[in-house]
C-alpha cells in the first residue's frame, strides 16, 4: 500500500476541514501533533543518551507543535531548551510558553548567534520545529543563520512535518548554505508532504486524529497506528500524491 502525500494546498484544506466539519480546535490539533513529535523523539533518541534537547521553534503552528513537544519531553525525563527567537503573540502561544515556564524549561526568545552556537554545543539533539507545510522560501534571518549553524554543527536533527528550508512540494534547496540541510529523522504530520519523497532517513507519521469521513473526502491512504502509539514508522514506504 502506498501512503498518500498532501500538497501544501491540500494540507491547508485538510486542516481547515478538521477545524470546521471535524470539530477540532487548534489547541487540540497542536497538542496531538506535539505529542506525536515527542513520541518520535523518544523512539529514536532515548533520554538515557540524548537528554539535552534543543527545540528550535518558528513563529507559526509548526513552532507551536515544538512548544507542546518540549513539555512532553520534560515529562519523559529529557532536559529540553526551547529556542524561540520570534515568539507569536496569540494567546495560545503565550499559554504554551507559560506551561513551559512552570516546569522551569528555558525558553530563549531572542536571537544571538554566539548564544545559539553554545546551545548547540551543549545539546545532543535538535528538534527542527521552525517551518511547516505553509513555508515558501527564501529563508529569512534569524532562521537562515540558525539552520546554517545546525548544518555546520553536525548535530542529530529531527524535523517536524517537513525539513525547514525545503520547498513543501519540490524538496530540498538546490544551492546555497542550506542545500545540505538533511535531518536524521522526519516526522510527517497528518500525511507526508511531497518533499518527503526526496527524504531517505528515518521517517515517522504522526497525527492520529483523521476521521474516516475526512479520510474518504480527501481520498487518503494512511497506515494504521499500532496499539496506543501516536506515531507509525513509514521509513522507505512508497508514497503517492492524492
Curated annotation (Swiss-Prot):
K(+) binds at residues 62, 128, 164. GO terms for molecular function: metal ion binding; NAD(P)HX epimerase activity; nucleotide binding. It is found in: Cytoplasm; Mitochondrion; Nucleus. GO terms for cellular component: cytosol; mitochondrion; nucleus. It catalyses: (6R)-NADHX = (6S)-NADHX; (6R)-NADPHX = (6S)-NADPHX. Its cofactor is K(+). (6S)-NADPHX binds at residues 61-65, 132-138, 161. SUPFAM superfamilies: YjeF N-terminal domain-like. Its EC number is 5.1.99.6. Binds 1 potassium ion per subunit. It comes from the Eukaryota. Keywords: Cytoplasm, Isomerase, Metal-binding, Mitochondrion, NAD, NADP, Nucleotide-binding, Nucleus, Potassium. GO terms for biological process: nicotinamide nucleotide metabolic process. HAMAP family: NADHX_epimerase. Belongs to the NnrE/AIBP family. PANTHER family: NAD(P)H-HYDRATE EPIMERASE. Catalyzes the epimerization of the S- and R-forms of NAD(P)HX, a damaged form of NAD(P)H that is a result of enzymatic or heat-dependent hydration. This is a prerequisite for the S-specific NAD(P)H-hydrate dehydratase to allow the repair of both epimers of NAD(P)HX. May have a role in meiosis. This is NAD(P)H-hydrate epimerase. The gene is mug182.
Amino acid at each position: 500500500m502506498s501512503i498518500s502525500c498532501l500538497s501544501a494546498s491540500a494540507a491547508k484544506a485538510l486542516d481547515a476541514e478538521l477545524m470546521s466539519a471535524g470539530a477540532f480546535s487548534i489547541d487540540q490539533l497542536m497538542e496531538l501533533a506535539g505529542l506525536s513529535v515527542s513520541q518520535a523523539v523518544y523512539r529514536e533518541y532515548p533520554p538515557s543518551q540524548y537528554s539535552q534537547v534543543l527545540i528550535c521553534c518558528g513563529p507559526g503552528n509548526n513552532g507551536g507543535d515544538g512548544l507542546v513537544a518540549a513539555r512532553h519531553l520534560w515529562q519523559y525525563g529529557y532536559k529540553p531548551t526551547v529556542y524561540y527567537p520570534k515568539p507569536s503573540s496569540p494567546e495560545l502561544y503565550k499559554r504554551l510558553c507559560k506551561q513551559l515556564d512552570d516546569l522551569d524549561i528555558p525558553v530563549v526568545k531572542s536571537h544571538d548567534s554566539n548564544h545559539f552556537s553554545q546551545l548547540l554545543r551543549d545539546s545532543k539533539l535538535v528538534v527542527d520545529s521552525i517551518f511547516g507545510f505553509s513555508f515558501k522560501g527564501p529563508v529569512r534571518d534569524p532562521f537562515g543563520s540558525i539552520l546554517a549553524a545546525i548544518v555546520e554543527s553536525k548535530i542529530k536533527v529531527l524535523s517536524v512535518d517537513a525539513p525547514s528550508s525545503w520547498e513543501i512540494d519540490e524538496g530540498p534547496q538546490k544551492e546555497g548554505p542550506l542545500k545540505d540541510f538533511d535531518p536524521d529523522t522526519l516526522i510527517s504530520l497528518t500525511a507526508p508532504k511531497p518533499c518527503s519523497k526526496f527524504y531517505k532517513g528515518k521517517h515517522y507519521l504522526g497525527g492520529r486524529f483523521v476521521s474516516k469521513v475526512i479520510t474518504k473526502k480527501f481520498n487518503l491512504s494512511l497506515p494504521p497506528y499500532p496499539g496506543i502509539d501516536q506515531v507509525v514508522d513509514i521509513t522507505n514506504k512508497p508514497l503517492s500524491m492524492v
